Amino acid sequence: FLGDAPTGVLLGGPRAVRSDEWGTLTPLCFRQQYNTLGAYNRYSQTIGLVRTDNMLVYGQPAWDILTLFRPFYWGYLFFGSERGLSWFWCARLLVLFLSWFELGMLISDGQKKLSVMLGICVSWAPFIQWWFAINGLVEMLIYGAFFVLGTNYLVSHAFNPRKIAVAVGMAVCAVGYVLTFYPTWMVPVAWGFVPLFLWVVIWKFDRKVLRRVDVVPWLLIFVITAAGLTVLALTSWDVIKAELNSVYPGNAPSSSGGTGLWWMMKYPISLVSRFSMNELIVENSSIICFAPAGFILALWVIIKEKKKDPLLILLLGINLFLAWYYCVGIPKWLAKMLLLSFVNSNRGPQVLGFLRLTLFVRAVALKEKAPKRWLAALAAVISSAVPMRLALGFTKYEPGGLRYEYFDTAEKFVVVWAILAVVFYLLYRARKSKYTMAVLGVCTVVLASSIWINPVAKGVPEITKSETMQQIRDLVKEDPQAIWLVVDM
C-alpha cells in the first residue's frame, strides 16, 4: 500500500491491479474513523475539502439509520477499521456461500451435494473474487438469494413469530440491494432472480396453510422498505441525480446487441488467468458456468425425459431472452421499460453466469436418465468447443491498440479444452442422486481458477505500522490544523 512496511500477507500475494479496492474503497472506509466531522459521520471532508455524502457512491460505514441495511459495515462501527475490514471480507464470503447453498437446496429439492457445488461456484467464481469488494456485487447476490428464500418461507408456512423476523430480514435485503447503487449490475442481477421469485410465488404457494393474518409480514416488508427508500431519497437526492446522469455507470452505453456472445462465453479465459496477469484480467474474468452444458441438460430433461418443470422452463426462458438481448438486441423503448438500458455490453453478460449455474443445477437435479457413453463423450467434445472458440477469439483492445492473447500457446488451449470436455462429459452422464464425480469436477475447476486470487492477510500493518504513517502522525500532532497536499503518492 505504502511500500515501506510488511504486508501481513500469510498466503497469496497482494493484487496491485485492484487499485479501486486498496486505493479507493478501503482508504475511504478507513478515513471514517478519523473523520474531522466526527468518527463515522455520514458526511466527510477529510479527503478533499468539500463536504461529501458517504452513503451511496463507494458507500462507507457511518452512524446513520440507513446503515441498518448494511450489516457488513457494522464491523467498522463496533470494532474499528482493522477488524472492520476483516468483518467486511470474511462475513461476506461466508454469508455468500451459505445463502447460495440454501438457494441450491431450494432449487435442487434438497440435494446437498448440488447445493454445495452451487455455493462454491458462486462464492469462488473468478469474477466474484476479482470484484469481491467493489460496487456491491456480493451484496446483490446475497440479498437477492435471501429475498427469494424469505419469500419461499412466507408463502409455504403457516403464520408464526418467525415470519416477522423473516419479513424484517427481507426488508433489509430490499433496501440494502438499492444501496449498492450500481445500476449496470443491479439490473441484470435482479433479472436473474426473477424466474426464481416467480416460481416460488406461483408454484410454491400453499393455500392450505395461509390465512389472512399472513398478509402482515408483507405489509411489514412494504412499510420498512418504503421508509428506508424515503429516507434515502430525502437525504441523498442530489447524489442519486448526479449518479444517474453520469456518463458511467448512470448512462452506460446500452448492451442491446453487439458483442454479448463473446462476454457470455469467454469463461475459459479464467482457467488460464493465473498465467496471464495483465491489468485487464479483472475486466475479462468470468463466472465459470459451464455453458452451454446447462442449456443442453435442460433441453434433455424437457424433451427427452418429457418433464415440463416450471422452474426449468422459466430459467431457460430468461436465459434465452437475455442472450437475445445481448447478442441481437431489442427496441430501445422495451429496453428502457425493462431497465436494461442501464446495462452495458460487458457488465451485464458477466454477472449472468450465476443464472446459467442455477439452470444446470436444476437440470441435473431433475435428470433421471443418461445418454450412452459414446454420445455423452461426443456431445462433451463438441459443446465444450463452443466456449473454447469464443475464448480463443476474445481479444481486448486499449485505445493505444495494445492486444492481449490469453491462449498464446497451443498447449494452453488443448489442456483447457480437455478439462472442460471431461467436466462436460461428467455432467452429461450425471443423473439424479448419481452425480458425485460431476460435482467434484466442477468444484475442482472453479476453485483452481479462483482460490489464489485474493491473498489471506493478518491485520493491515502496511497502513498502521509503516514509517510513512508514523511520520504523518508526528506531523499532525505538531500542527493538527494543517491542510495537507499529497503529490505522487
Regions found by a protein language model. Name each.
Residues 96-104, 144-155, 194-199, 203, ...:
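Transmembrane alpha-helical segments
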Residues 97-106, 112-205, 214-237, 383-390, ...:
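Membrane-embedded helix bundles of polyisoprenyl
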Residues 372-488:
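Transmembrane helical bundles and short interhelical boundary loops of multi-pass, membrane-embedded
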